[in-house]
Amino acid sequence: MGKKLDKKAKAGKSIKKLRKLEGKLWTREYLLKIAEFDGATIAPANGAAARADAMGTLAGEHHKLLTSEKSVELVRSLARETVAGGKIDDPQLLDEIRVLGRDQREASAIPTEEAEAWTRLTCEADAVWHKAKAANDWASFETYVDRIVAQLKHQAELMD
């Protein structure tokens, strides 16, 4: 009986760590979305480069946190606990562990520097897109489309 309680306590600690990790990841995702929304709505157009740099840095922090050895091992250990004896029976928690594990595998295929560069590129492209759309100026946005497509192809290759 003592071993069973000990395993439940260990799972409880791991779940608390998972909740803390999810909170840190969510905070960074939330801040990125606020900056993205700000850039698409009311932020000064000439601030796009600084916003892209800040968002790239924040995206890098998110990527490092998501793919750190500590985070990956936490999710793996929780996944093992779900498979090895059903120590976790909350369906939502099981799905969170599964999705976070998938997110980690995908993110781990891409170096942090490339995740940062992707965020910078898409932030800059968004600012150019809004100007180009209003002016019916496809040519000014075309180079961004080419760069975005090339980067997406590269990311797909890394994930294969």
Residue ranges and their predicted role:
Residues 2-159:
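A well-structured
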